[in-house]
């Protein structure tokens, strides 16, 4: 992909303007504007993709934009997934720009390359690419119930599914089993891949799985969780919002439970 393009003043484009991992929003949306309508300098803009036949640009914010107009990407949950992911790409590239500005080999200053999304050392030419941390996320089913957990970091008190970072030398399936047992005391079986989602908080890739209960009683790790429960569809607490892979996993598990009940009733 060409990352630097000549901008046409009359061309409508989406502008992902980033400041401190937050995005510039107009009317709660990523701005779709012509360059001539913009009030800030766009010389450093990089094209990061296309959405609905319009280019999408990443741009670091400058001082002429009011800080009150910047919001976390969570404010965009529920918009079309393709545009949400492009906004995430912009925030991840911004994260790279600000956290990988020195070479990991020789310590020299690194700058953003002109021809790729990488930070290139000005002394030894080593290229550093955006760091992406692999994470698993899993919905566990026990007959007509789903395993849900509450985290202290969720100030709204929502319940979600189990997630965690993959360790070195570990398969994704091993990580699923380990994270579930470490956080809840539950052992699982029939672990199967479901889907994935880039998650720019700050720079993760969420790899989603479904699994079935095998054994054990819930015994939450209170360093990680504030609660863990088995919940039936009719008894769900507040859960992860739409637009998250966690919500997709919850909805899929509830659909599987409903389908199983339907077959049993035939």
UniProtKB/Swiss-Prot annotation:
Gene Ontology, cellular component aspect: cytosol
InterPro entries: NAD-cap_RNA_hydrolase_NudC, NudC-like_C, Nudix_hydrolase, NUDIX_hydrolase-like_dom_sf, NUDIX_hydrolase_CS, NUDIX_hydrolase_dom, RNA_Hydrolase_NudC, Znr_NADH_PPase
Xref: Gene3D superfamilies: 3.90.79.20, Nucleoside Triphosphate Pyrophosphohydrolase
Binding site for a divalent metal cation 2: 179
Motif (Nudix box): 164-185
Residues annotated for a divalent metal cation 1 binding in this entry: 163, 183, 224
Annotated keywords: Hydrolase, Magnesium, Manganese, Metal-binding, NAD, Zinc
CDD domains: NUDIX_NADH_pyrophosphatase_Nudt13
Binding-site positions, a divalent metal cation 3: 179, 183, 224
GO biological process terms on file: NAD catabolic process; NADH metabolic process; NADP catabolic process
Residues that coordinate or bind substrate: 74, 129, 197-204, 246
Molecular-function annotations in GO: magnesium ion binding; manganese ion binding; NAD+ diphosphatase activity; NADH pyrophosphatase activity; RNA NAD-cap (NMN-forming) hydrolase activity; zinc ion binding
Pfam family, one: NUDIX
EC number: 3.6.1.-, 3.6.1.22
Cofactor: Mg(2+); Mn(2+); Zn(2+)
Keyword Isomerase: no
Recorded catalytic activity of this chain's protein: a 5'-end NAD(+)-phospho-ribonucleoside in mRNA + H2O = a 5'-end phospho-adenosine-phospho-ribonucleoside in mRNA + beta-nicotinamide D-ribonucleotide + 2 H(+); NAD(+) + H2O = beta-nicotinamide D-ribonucleotide + AMP + 2 H(+); NADH + H2O = reduced beta-nicotinamide D-ribonucleotide + AMP + 2 H(+)
Domain spans labelled Nudix hydrolase: 130-253
Cofactor binding note from Swiss-Prot or TrEMBL: Divalent metal cations. Mg(2+) or Mn(2+).
Record's subunit section: Homodimer.
Its job: mRNA decapping enzyme that specifically removes the nicotinamide adenine dinucleotide (NAD) cap from a subset of mRNAs by hydrolyzing the diphosphate linkage to produce nicotinamide mononucleotide (NMN) and 5' monophosphate mRNA. The NAD-cap is present at the 5'-end of some mRNAs and stabilizes RNA against 5'-processing. Has preference for mRNAs with a 5'-end purine. Catalyzes the hydrolysis of a broad range of dinucleotide pyrophosphates.
Protein name: NAD-capped RNA hydrolase NudC
Organism for this UniProt entry: Photobacterium profundum (strain SS9)
């Amino acid at each position: 992909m060409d990352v630097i393009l000549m901008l046409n003043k009359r061309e409508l484009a989406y502008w992902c303007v980033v400041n401190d991992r937050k995005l510039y929003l107009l009317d709660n949306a990523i701005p779709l504007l012509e360059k001539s309508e913009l009030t800030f300098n766009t010389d450093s803009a990089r094209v990061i993709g296309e959405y609905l036949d319009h280019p999408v640009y990443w741009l670091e914010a400058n001082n002429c934009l009011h800080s009150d107009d910047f919001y976390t990407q969570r404010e965009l949950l529920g918009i079309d997934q393709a545009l949400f992911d492009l906004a995430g790409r912009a925030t991840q590239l911004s994260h790279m720009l600000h956290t990988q500005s020195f070479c990991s080999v020789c310590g020299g200053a690194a700058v953003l390359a002109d021809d790729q999304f990488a930070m290139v050392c000005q002394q030894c030419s080593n290229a550093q690419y955006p760091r992406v941390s692999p994470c698993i996320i899993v919905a566990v089913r026990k007959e007509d119930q789903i395993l849900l957990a509450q985290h202290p970091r969720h100030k709204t008190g929502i319940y979600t599914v189990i997630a965690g970072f993959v360790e070195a030398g570990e398969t994704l399936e091993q990580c699923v089993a380990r994270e579930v047992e470490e956080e809840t005391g539950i052992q699982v079986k029939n672990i199967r891949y479901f889907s994935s989602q880039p998650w720019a908080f700050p720079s993760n890739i969420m790899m989603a799985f479904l699994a079935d209960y095998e054994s054990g009683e819930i015994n939450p790790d209170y360093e990680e969780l504030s609660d863990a429960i088995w919940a039936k569809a009719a008894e769900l607490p507040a859960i992860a919002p739409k637009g998250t892979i966690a919500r997709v996993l919850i909805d899929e598990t509830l659909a599987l439970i409903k389908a199983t009940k339907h077959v049993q009733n035939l």
